[in-house]
C-alpha cells in the first residue's frame, strides 16, 4: 500500500468521502487520489515521491507556476506583519485599484473569500439593484455551491450524474431559470415569458465546468443585447477565465462588456479569495453605501491580498506571458488533435488560449447535452494511463486542462510522448 493509499484510508474515517471537495476523490476515474506534498513550477510531487507534470494548476490560479519566488517572498513578508486583523488595510485598497485599472468594466470591486461567495453576492446585488427576483443560468455551467445555483450545474455535480443537490429546498431554486448554453433563442423565450422579473443573466463566458465549451459567434453579444433591452444585469463568472485568457479575461478576449464580474482563486494566486465588481451605480447598492448586505471577517485578508496583488502585478508587467501561454496551448492542444485524428479515435478538442478539454465524443461539443455524450469510460482509461506515467490531468471528463507560464516545450513534449503510448495501447 502506498502512502497516498494509507492517507486516503485514514481520511475516509474523518472526512466525508475522504476529501474536502468531491472531484479530488478520483471516483469518476476509478482511482484513489494522490496526496500532494509539494509543488514547483509545472510539477507536483506526491507523498510517495512521485513527480507529475501538472495540468490542473490548482484549478487555474497557478498561472505563473507553483511556488513562484516573488509571490512566496511577498506572502512571507505579509505573514510577519500578522495573519488577519478584521480591519481595513492599505493592501486591499491597492488590490482593488489594480483590478479596476486592469478590467475596464469594473469601476468598484468588493473582496470576498471564494468564487462561490462572489457569485452568491453578485446575484444578491443584481436583485437588489433591479428589484427583481429571477435569474437565468445555463445548463452545465457551474457557479459554486450556493443553493440557488445548484440547478443543472456542472463540475462535480455533473460528474456525479446528479442534476441537483439534496438539501436544497424548492423555494431556493424556483427563481432560477435555465437555458442551454449557446442557445440565444432559448434565452429570448425566457425573456418573452418573464421579462419584467429577470434580475440577472449569469454565464461562464467560456464554460469550463462541463469541460471547456466555447461560446458560439454572437452568443455573448446576444446576451448583452437582451440584457440591455430588458434592464437586466449581465454577470460574467470569470472564476476560470479571469486574468487567464488575457489581463482583462474573457470579456476582453471576446469584446463583450458585462455589468458585473466575479472572480475566484486566481486573484489570490491560489489563496482563498474571491471578488465581485462592476459598474459603480450597481455596486453602490452594497452596504454600507446601500441596502444590499454582504460582509465577511476574512474578506480582504492581508495575506491573500498580498499574494494576489503580486501575481496580478507580474501579469500586468509581463504581457508577453500571455503570448507564451497561447503558444504553449496551441502546441499542446494542436498536437493532441493531430495525434487523435491519426489514431482514428473519436474525440473533440475544445480549447482557447491556455485552457482546454479533450472529450471522447463523436460530435461537436457545444452545450451540456453534447458534453454528456462523451465516453467517460474511455476518459477513465486515458486518465489512468497518463497519471501512472506522471501526467496529472483533471480526474473527471468534465473539467478543464490548465497551462501555466512554467510549462515549457520539455513538459509539452513529455506529455505528448506519453499520449503516444496511450494511443498505441488502445489500438
UniProtKB/Swiss-Prot annotation:
Gene Ontology cellular component annotations, sorted alphabetically: cytoplasm
Cofactor(s) named in the record: pyridoxal 5'-phosphate
Protein name: Glutamate-1-semialdehyde 2,1-aminomutase 1
Lineage, top ranks: Bacteria, Bacillati, Bacillota, Clostridia, Lachnospirales
Subcellular location: Cytoplasm
Source species: Lachnoclostridium phytofermentans (strain ATCC 700394 / DSM 18823 / ISDg)
Keyword field contains Transmembrane: no
Domain of life: Bacteria
Pathway(s) where this gene product acts: Porphyrin-containing compound metabolism; protoporphyrin-IX biosynthesis; 5-aminolevulinate from L-glutamyl-tRNA(Glu): step 2/2
HAMAP family, A to Z: HemL_aminotrans_3
EC top class, as a word: isomerase
Similarity comment text for this entry: Belongs to the class-III pyridoxal-phosphate-dependent aminotransferase family. HemL subfamily.
A GO molecular function held by the record: glutamate-1-semialdehyde 2,1-aminomutase activity
The protein's assembly and partners: Homodimer.
N6-(pyridoxal phosphate)lysine: residues bearing it: 265
PROSITE patterns, sorted: AA_TRANSFER_CLASS_3
Reaction(s) this enzyme catalyzes, per UniProt: (S)-4-amino-5-oxopentanoate = 5-aminolevulinate
Assigned keywords, A-Z: Cytoplasm, Isomerase, Porphyrin biosynthesis, Pyridoxal phosphate
Record-linked Gene3D superfamilies: Aspartate Aminotransferase, domain 1, Type I PLP-dependent aspartate aminotransferase-like (Major domain)
Disulfide pattern: none
Biological-process GO terms, alphabetical: protoporphyrinogen IX biosynthetic process
Alphabetized InterPro entries for the sequence: 4pyrrol_synth_GluAld_NH2Trfase, Aminotrans_3, Aminotrans_3_PPA_site, PyrdxlP-dep_Trfase, PyrdxlP-dep_Trfase_major, PyrdxlP-dep_Trfase_small
EC number(s) reported in the record: 5.4.3.8
Amino acid at each position: 500500500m502506498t502512502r497516498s493509499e494509507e492517507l486516503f484510508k485514514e481520511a475516509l474515517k474523518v472526512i466525508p468521502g475522504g476529501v474536502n471537495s468531491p472531484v479530488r476523490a478520483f471516483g469518476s476515474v476509478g482511482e484513489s487520489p494522490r496526496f500532494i506534498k509539494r509543488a514547483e513550477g509545472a510539477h507536483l510531487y506526491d507523498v510517495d515521491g512521485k513527480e507529475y507534470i501538472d495540468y490542473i494548476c490548482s484549478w487555474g490560479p497557478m498561472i505563473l507556476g507553483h511556488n513562484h519566488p516573488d509571490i512566496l517572498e511577498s506572502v512571507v513578508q505579509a505573514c510577519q506583519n500578522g495573519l488577519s486583523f478584521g480591519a481595513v488595510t492599505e493592501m486591499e485598497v491597492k488590490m482593488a485599484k489594480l483590478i479596476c485599472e486592469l478590467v475596464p468594466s469594473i469601476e468598484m470591486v468588493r473582496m470576498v473569500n471564494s468564487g462561490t461567495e462572489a457569485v452568491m453576492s453578485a446575484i444578491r446585488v443584481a436583485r437588489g439593484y433591479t428589484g427583481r427576483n429571477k435569474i437565468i443560468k445555463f445548463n452545465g455551467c457551474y457557479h459554486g455551491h450556493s443553493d440557488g445555483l445548484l440547478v443543472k450545474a456542472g463540475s462535480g455535480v455533473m460528474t456525479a450524474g446528479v442534476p441537483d443537490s439534496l438539501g436544497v429546498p424548492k423555494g431556493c431554486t424556483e427563481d432560477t431559470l435555465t437555458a442551454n448554453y449557446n442557445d440565444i433563442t432559448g434565452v429570448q423565450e425566457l425573456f418573452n415569458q418573464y421579462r419584467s422579473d429577470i434580475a440577472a443573466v449569469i454565464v461562464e463566458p467560456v464554460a469550463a465546468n462541463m469541460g471547456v465549451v466555447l461560446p458560439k459567434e454572437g452568443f455573448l453579444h446576444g446576451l448583452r443585447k437582451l440584457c440591455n433591452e430588458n434592464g437586466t444585469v449581465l454577470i460574467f463568472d470569470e472564476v476560470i477565465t479571469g486574468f487567464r485568457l488575457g489581463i482583462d479575461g474573457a470579456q476582453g478576449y471576446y469584446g463583450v462588456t458585462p455589468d458585473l464580474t466575479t472572480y475566484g482563486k486566481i486573484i489570490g494566486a491560489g489563496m482563498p479569495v474571491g471578488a465581485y465588481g462592476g459598474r459603480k451605480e450597481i455596486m453602490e447598492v452594497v452596504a454600507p453605501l446601500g441596502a444590499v448586505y454582504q460582509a465577511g471577517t476574512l474578506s480582504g485578508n492581508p495575506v491573500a491580498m498580498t499574494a494576489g496583488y503580486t501575481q496580478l502585478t507580474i501579469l500586468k508587467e509581463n504581457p508577453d506571458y500571455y503570448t507564451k501561454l497561447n503558444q504553449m496551448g496551441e502546441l499542446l492542444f494542436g498536437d493532441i488533435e493531430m495525434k487523435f485524428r491519426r489514431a482514428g479515435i473519436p474525440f473533440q478538442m475544445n480549447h482557447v488560449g491556455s485552457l482546454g478539454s479533450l472529450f471522447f465524443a463523436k460530435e461537436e461539443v457545444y452545450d451540456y447535452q453534447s458534453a454528456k455524450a462523451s465516453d467517460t469510460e474511455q476518459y477513465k482509461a486515458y486518465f489512468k494511463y497518463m497519471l501512472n506515467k506522471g501526467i496529472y490531468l483533471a480526474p473527471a471528463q468534465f473539467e478543464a486542462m490548465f497551462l501555466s507560464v512554467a510549462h515549457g516545450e520539455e513538459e509539452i513534449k513529455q506529455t505528448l510522448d506519453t499520449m503516444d503510448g496511450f494511443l498505441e495501447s488502445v489500438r
